[in-house]
Amino acid sequence: RHCCRLNYGVRGKRYFAIGFPNVAGGYEIRSRYFKGCVPPKDVSLIKPKDTASDVCSVFEGFMDFLSAAALGIGGNSDSLVLNSVANVGKAVKHLDGYGRIDCFLDCDEAGRRTLEALKGHYGGRVCDRSALYDGCKDLNEYLQLTAKNEQ
């Protein structure tokens, strides 16, 4: 639903990877052997409904977005995937119209800086949701631990 298969070649060898599209026509790509992008690099915006949402969930990477979907988090809200904390400036034009911005960012220095940058721009509209996965690096790690504990 959110991803596609991308086929590519390097030095005559054929490979495939998961592709996650961004708003500029590029893709974030992941495989067992490779993590990168097909330019241009930009944010990804997912709107599950035709009607406008007042809430947008923000994720650092698409694996965290997919983890949230698997956990049933933010299903009715719009979602913005930064695809790199360096893209926080590109996110601003997409986040302006939301009344609440729920941040599911990594529990590291880059995630904290990104959260502070968003709070500096949007103030009280920004909500830090990382307490949900406290003790984990990110939402994807939390999902993996949760799934492992349920086995």
Where are these regions (language model features)?
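TOPRIM fold recognition
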Residues: 54, 70-151
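Phosphate-handling DNA/RNA-contact segment within nucleic-acid enzymes
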Residues: 6-94
